[in-house]
């Protein structure tokens, strides 16, 4: 028999959810009053579906902050993993809910869970929530966490064209030339044909001559005479100035949280603005 929506079943990549509990349903829908009644009556807040989805996963993925709070207060496992290895913090970041992210972190959620797939920071970059990205970095998220499918968070942000997230990552000290199969963030920017993104990456020191596993430079993924192609052509003919190269070198030397270090330098405000890419 085919699963039906009314049965609480969901056909997915791995299989399908069956017999989702009333706690799962209330958490996902944001029905906080019903959820509280279920908790008060002794319902288990850590019961999982066949895909190892807990009610906390369900609430986090939908950005249901009030339900997340109720579940955590009732003893929900903050770092429970589903069948894909994702934690509720990963799901909260995927939803872009800063409220859920803050709640989970306040209950001790790991910002860098040992995963081979997307980390919370990857998920925040996918959703395009620069606010979540900034918060995760502030509490110690690994800027170079490597996802076996996507690469680093910077790769993800560039592939999804989330420029605000890209700038937050770069200002925090993310490696602009980090590679996955020799493919850099600049290759992604070229593929999505985003001139603003291309310029930003180059200004932060992106290598326009980097070659991927096919032996292609970023410019090889642009069409002749297109705006992205002309952008690469300009930077090939007009390399970064000495002042720009000095900025790249200094920011690289300051490492993670470089922006904070730059702001404390005893130099003129105009230089601080320049080094901060303002």
Swiss-Prot record:
ANK repeats: 18-47, 51-80, 84-113, 116-145, 149-178, 181-210
PROSITE patterns in UniProt: ANK_REP_REGION, ANK_REPEAT, SOCS
Biochemical pathway: Protein modification; protein ubiquitination
SMART domains: ANK, SOCS_box
Cystine pairs: none
Function: May be a substrate-recognition component of a SCF-like ECS (Elongin-Cullin-SOCS-box protein) E3 ubiquitin-protein ligase complex which mediates the ubiquitination and subsequent proteasomal degradation of target proteins.
Domain comment (free text): The SOCS box domain mediates the interaction with the Elongin BC complex, an adapter module in different E3 ubiquitin-protein ligase complexes.
PANTHER family the record matches: ANKYRIN REPEAT AND SOCS BOX CONTAINING 13 (PTHR24136:SF53), SOWAH (DROSOPHILA) HOMOLOG (PTHR24136)
Protein's UniProt name: Ankyrin repeat and SOCS box protein 13
Organism in which the protein naturally occurs: Mus musculus
């Amino acid at each position: 028999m085919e699963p039906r929506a009314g049965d609480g079943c969901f056909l997915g990549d791995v299989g399908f959810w069956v017999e989702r509990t009333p706690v799962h349903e209330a958490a996902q829908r944001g029905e906080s009053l019903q959820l509280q009644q279920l908790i008060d009556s002794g319902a288990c807040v850590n019961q999982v579906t066949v895909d190892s989805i807990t009610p906390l996963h369900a609430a986090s993925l939908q950005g249901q902050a009030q339900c997340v709070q109720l579940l955590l207060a009732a003893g929900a496992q903050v770092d429970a993993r589903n069948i894909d290895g994702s934690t509720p913090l990963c799901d909260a970041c995927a939803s872009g809910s800063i409220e859920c992210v803050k709640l989970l972190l306040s209950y001790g959620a790991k910002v860098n869970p040992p995963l081979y797939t997307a980390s919370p920071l990857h998920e925040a970059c996918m959703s395009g929530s620069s606010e979540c990205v900034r918060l995760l970095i502030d509490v110690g998220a690994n800027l170079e966490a490597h996802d076996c499918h996507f690469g680093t968070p910077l790769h993800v942000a560039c592939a999804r064209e989330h420029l605000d997230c890209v700038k937050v990552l770069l200002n925090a000290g993310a490696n602009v030339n980090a590679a996955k199969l020799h493919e850099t963030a600049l290759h992604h920017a070229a593929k999505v044909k985003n001139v603003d993104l291309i310029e930003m990456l180059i200004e932060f020191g992106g290598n326009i001559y980097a070659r991927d596993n096919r032996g292609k430079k970023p410019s090889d993924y642009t069409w002749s005479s297109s705006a992205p192609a002309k952008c690469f052509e300009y930077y090939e003919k007009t390399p970064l100035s000495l002042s720009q190269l000095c900025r790249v070198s200094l920011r690289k030397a300051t490492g993670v949280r470089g922006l904070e270090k730059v702001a404390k330098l005893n130099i003129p405000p105009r230089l601080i603005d320049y080094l901060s890419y303002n």
